[in-house]
Amino acid sequence: MNYSQFLNMIPEATLMVVLLITFIADFCSSKSADRKWFNPLVCLLMVAHIVINIFPTEATEAFGGMYTTGSAAGVLKTILALGTLIVMVQAKEWLSRKDTAFKEGEFYMLIISTLLGMNMMVSANHFLLFFLGLEMASVPMACLVAFDKYRHNSAEAGAKFILTATFSSGVMIYGISLLYAACGTLYFDDIAKVISASPLTIAGMVFFFSGLGFKISLVPFHFWTADSYQGAPTTVTGYLSVVSKGAAAFTLCAILMKVFQPMLEYWTVLLYIVIVLSITIANLFAIRQSDLKRFMAFSSISQAGYIMLAVVGNSAMSVSALTYYVLIYVVANLSVFTIISSIEEHNNGTVQMDSYNGLYKTNPRLAFLMTLALFSLGGIPPFAGMFSKFFVFMAAVGTHDIHTTLGAWAYGVVFIALVNTVISLYYYLLIVKAMFIKHSDNPLPTFQSACSTKLALAICTVGIVAFGICSFVFDWISVAVNA
């Protein structure tokens, strides 16, 4: 084996170093001691990883072309690493509890392992490497979902997650086997050269799409989402809702546009149907929720529909819009989950929406920051979420002629998405109404968040405001994608 090939895998190599140092530091230090230095150490290692890999790199490959990377994949890996860093910073308060402090090292090692698997997925040019990366991300994620294993809800959520992940992986493997039977290869480039629309390849594409649809929580593959989000620790739920979803969505986009390009008409229609169902059904279910984590679960299903809307444009603009949307979604959604986690720690673990009644009077800063994040998720200007939705809508219709069948479908789906954006504003404003207008006989007491929570919220809030105002962010992503 030529170990110099690892030099072409700098993002993965640096993550392996971060994982190794984290393991050694955890192994060599006493878990009974006060380890205030451990979280800053891991976070600094992640910052170093981001700094090393933040600039777009030239296209490289390794392992006989099974692994390929370029500037577009590099940008997404940086965004995923940023989301992971925010989760690590935000997790400090939760991991300081007596029942979780002794598992702090395990948490960081699991979360870094999932990120490593996602990086492999993003850079895969072969279905074998893609599947290995997917499982490398899924197995540690199941452990994270069941991290509070002595809580019934967390153990149940972990069981549901692993069963669903197993089933979806089986469906995906079956689809890949059909594609191999039809094309005789598992390399993405080689499949794209020989694939054509036949019953076998169409079935393979549908099964593969269905398997990855489970990972992204697209309707009708979403049934596990609400229960797993509700039962998992809030910090893990935030990570699952943004980083995992972003990696899977980017990978699906790349495979559809690269491998299944000759079958464009088939997967585009399939995407139209799934997008409309995801956005509409998730919005209708979100309105009925009283538990905030279940509420955010259906919100994430709806956001997944918007993310995939960019793919139907089938252009470089699609990849740019999807990557930018994931970036904005990371900071906005993690801001919401950071606040939920902080309030949960000071409110006896309650995440019911009515417990937020009158939050503005007792904790005005948290109420204000929550409002900013919800406005961004809803697409209200001038926050970054509005621009991300605008670019997604532009990407969806940009290359389509309205006089063609696919073009008419594209414009129709964008119109439905616009209508659903208004519906989503209604249910996001339900939380704002609870915080600013509704009164409570037993309001949440005034409290001071931990410094780590304040830092995570500062990073997210700066992103929500700055990424919308600074147009160079989208320009930088576009240049990287087109490089």
Regions found by a protein language model. Give the residues of each.
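Alpha-helical transmembrane segments of multi-pass membrane proteins predominantly involved
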Residues: 1-483
